[in-house]
Amino acid sequence: MSPVISHPRSAAARHQSDELSPITITVDCPAKTNLTLEVGPAHDEWGGRHELDTTYCAIGVYDTVTATAKQPGAGFSLELEGAYLGDLASSRSDMRRNHAVLALFAMAQAAEREPDVALTITKRIPVGAGLGGGSADAAATMLAVNRLWELNWPIERLRTIAATLGADMPFCLTGGLAYGTGFGERITDIAPGSRDELALIEQGFSGEVLVGAYQSQLSTPEVYHTFDIVGAAEGDRNHLQAAAISLHPRSGQAIDAATQAGASHAFVSGSGPSVVAFAADEAAAQRIIEVWRDTAVVDRIIRAKSPEHPNISVRQ
């Protein structure tokens, strides 16, 4: 399942909307986790990024990006909202390095337009957490601008642009389930009801999804640097898990607690420190929630569904 992209209007209507579109596009984009994450060698031609073989899963924790056209020549603007902004709220944060702004600039360059767009991001996905919040914001921006400017580019063209910005962004454009290779940017979607999806369900990747989130953040480059030293622990489906736990021990404690409480799977999400636990039923989910609360091994608990997809809405 892909986000809905509307049909193009006439050239005359497009010309009128170029002057100043009254339309506001809102995109809710889900977080991502990695059901498996095998990390290979680093490649100089990829800027030092590691080769990856991963199974992506979009989970129902959503950031919301709203895009509205501004007057020609007005430039872009960015407003951040939400209770969990992390270091994005820092006065030292460079707005032009925000993933959504980079995505806007990339779309403007590809479309040969000026980035005269007002962006508002409502953050719910924890920042610096291994849940792809920045990638979700970038993907949501691309989907919004694609509709706002009536480009109507197919997902594959958007993925080509997204791949120049980051590893997870091509997946976040569609969500659901998918395999990722290369440095994570080469996406093969897993169709609903397919043999591959049924195999994941049989392996226990179904039911309730619980996210154990933290106030603290982990730097992805630091996690990879640590991985280069310590490697992957035997049996870990996420090769970055040992590195993340060495930097953030509470993640390991949360995994142990969830496993003992009956989680089908519990693991560090991506580069961490967030922990994702799958519970087969409501009773197991409640046990995990209770043990996480009682032991204080996580700072925040989020219940979610999976797999999820971006949602696009248009307001005149």
From Swiss-Prot:
Belongs to the GHMP kinase family. IspE subfamily. Keywords: ATP-binding, Isoprene biosynthesis, Kinase, Nucleotide-binding, Transferase. It catalyses: 4-CDP-2-C-methyl-D-erythritol + ATP = 4-CDP-2-C-methyl-D-erythritol 2-phosphate + ADP + H(+). One of its GO terms (molecular function) is 4-(cytidine 5'-diphospho)-2-C-methyl-D-erythritol kinase activity. GO terms for biological process: isopentenyl diphosphate biosynthetic process, methylerythritol 4-phosphate pathway; terpenoid biosynthetic process. Pathway: Isoprenoid biosynthesis; isopentenyl diphosphate biosynthesis via DXP pathway; isopentenyl diphosphate from 1-deoxy-D-xylulose 5-phosphate: step 3/6. It comes from the Bacteria. This is 4-diphosphocytidyl-2-C-methyl-D-erythritol kinase. Its EC number is 2.7.1.148. Catalyzes the phosphorylation of the position 2 hydroxy group of 4-diphosphocytidyl-2C-methyl-D-erythritol. The active site is at K32, D168.
